[in-house]
Amino acid sequence: MHELTYLQAGVIGLLQGITELFPVSSLGHSVLIPALIGGSWQHLVTENASGNSEGSPYLTFVVGLHVATAVALLVFFRSDWARVIRAFLTTLRTRRIETSAQRLAWLIVAATVPVGIIGLALEHTFRTLFAKPLAAALFLTANGMILLAGERLRRRSEQRAGTHQASARAEPATIPLTVPAPATVPTQTTSAPGGRATARHTTAPRGGLVVSEHRSLDTLAYREAGVIGLFQTLALLAGISRSGITMVAGLLRGLDHEDAARFSFLLATPVILAAGLLKLPALAGPAGDGIRGQVILGALIAGIAAYLSIRFLVRYFETRTLTPFAIYCLLTGALCTVRFAIA
């Protein structure tokens, strides 16, 4: 790792800051780009793939940049996190969940616990086995397929729901029957994190993979949040995007793109921060000798790039979808697969 130059640190920091939050896999790009450039850059990936230490020095450096990315997330969503943390502490004191902010706090906890446990147990194994150029290219292609499939499933579900509603309106009048009212999930009319008011009642979703009804973030069930958290563990595979996989899971459970992206970014904050903090002791010890300046430079660039990326993506997902990112992952993954398969 002593061969890491300031140029390499800056480029990798920029790459990390952008791709960590775009649904295109930061780890996959951190493996593929150096391998494509070759030379001393290729050596970084070769060193990573050797797996003969407790952790690859290169991946230790990359994960160390996560602290800067997490700080960017905390700064951008500072008002959200202030509300969520206050709400969480209030529930610990009162032992009741009464507001949308309090519910969101526990949804984040429910989604973070699974990835925390599995990540601690399997991170080293997964990254030693799969953080290689060909594997990263294959998983990047798979990431594109997941994003595209999620968008198509969501669109078909909405179309079916619209067809059923139109058919119901067109049906002739019938003898009225007394039937039970649909179950509702009561929620208080409060401002959710971000300042948006929540609905007073939301129809409870039916079972199944895809929920066709549009739902607000704070109406997710805790088990649904836990499943979304389990989806995050796929991001241990270089090429699978954490933000992409959690957004797809949110879309399938009825969230719109804006709420799915917001929940994804909120979930990413504690996970990315914890991953970075776990690696900081290694960088502060002998393993960091000769590269601490490079880490600082990379972290500064990663933090700035991450903040700008969040700002762009929050606005982007107000009106747009994951489809362009899916196409990018499919094309890039396929080209890289061919490149490294014949190398």
Curated annotation (Swiss-Prot):
One of its GO terms (biological process) is cell wall organization. The chain crosses the membrane at residues 21-41, 57-77, 104-124, 129-149, 225-245, 265-285, 294-314, 322-342. It comes from the Bacteria. It is a multi-pass membrane protein. It is found in: Cell membrane. Keywords: Antibiotic resistance, Cell membrane, Cell shape, Cell wall biogenesis/degradation, Hydrolase, Membrane, Peptidoglycan synthesis, Transmembrane, Transmembrane helix. This is Undecaprenyl-diphosphatase 2. It comes from Frankia alni (strain DSM 45986 / CECT 9034 / ACN14a). The gene is uppP2.
